[in-house]
Structure formats: structure tokens, C-alpha cells
């Protein structure tokens, strides 16, 4: 079951797509449930007879994303070496951008969800250019990267961190820090590259 702000995000994405946008960033705070929202979006893509792909910016996030799809009971294929969940016939694929950049075979997809879209890669730009009819939805809590607007047409912000706090979806943050830290006895060494460790 989606939370109201996740449903709002999906409705705002639909509205943006109906306006003709094919490159949209969903900007949502940490703990919004961006991956859960992405799972729901891709479920609807498959229900409409289309195919989707969830693109991670790091190989490490592939497994985490797979677990979210598994919790929803969704059949997905994983594009990663000889991963035990490789299934090229699945309507939804999960892949890292690194894997996609090395593959000669590119899956067919109608909607691509790009996790952590603020870390934009050259291959992602090429993928977006080659697939001009495909809808790309970027997910980010920090969509402030220089040049991101060159790749995306619309920005959706369904809820802010403050609103999530007000609705008790997040706990208030407490900050702690020292007044003065004495680093005079900390030992450092010069690295061969010229830096300091």
C-alpha cells in the first residue's frame, strides 16, 4: 500500500507525461520511499503491456533494488554477469549503468527509472539519446547536479522533508558537535600521489 505522498508522486508523473514530457526527475527526500514508488510505476507499466528497466548507479544497489521488487512479488530479471536472477524474458529488468555500458545487447524497454539520477553518466546520456521515445524517470533526494537540466524536462517535488516530519513519517533530527577539536596530536603521512593521509 502506497503512502499518500507516493500516490501524489505517481499522479504528478502521469500529469507530466500527459503534457508530453519524457524526461522527468522525481525529487523526494530520504525515506520518501522512492524505490517503492518506482516498483509501483513499473508494475503499472507491465499491466499496460509494456516493459521497464530500473537502472542503478552502482552495482551494490542492484541487490537492494531486487529485494524491493521481491517484497512486492514482482518477477524481474537482473542484468549483471552471471547473476542467478538473469531472466531476459522478464518484463522488468534491473541493471547498473556500468553493466549497461558494457553490454552489446540492450533490453527493450518503454519506461526507464534511473535511481540516483544526479550521478549522471556518459552512457546514460547516450542511452537517453538512442531511446528518444522512452520515458526516463530520474529519482533523487539531491537533484542539484550541474547540467541535470540538460537531460531532464520536468522536476516533480511531491513532498518536502519538513512535510514528512510534520506528518510523522520521519523523526526529528538532533545535531551534536564539539566546540573545538584538538588535532595537534593526529599523525599524518604524505602519500606517493602527493596527498596526505
Where are these regions (language model features)?
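Loop/turn-to-beta-strand initiation segments
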Residues: 50-51, 89-92, 109-111, 132-137
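Conserved Walker A/P-loop ATP-binding site and its immediately adjacent core
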Residues: 35-37, 44-71
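Conserved interdomain hinge at the start of the Helicase C-terminal
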Residues: 19, 42, 186-197
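Walker A/P-loop
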Residues: 19-41
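Conserved RecA-like ASCE ATPase "motif II neighborhood" in helicase/translocase motors
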Residues: 92-127
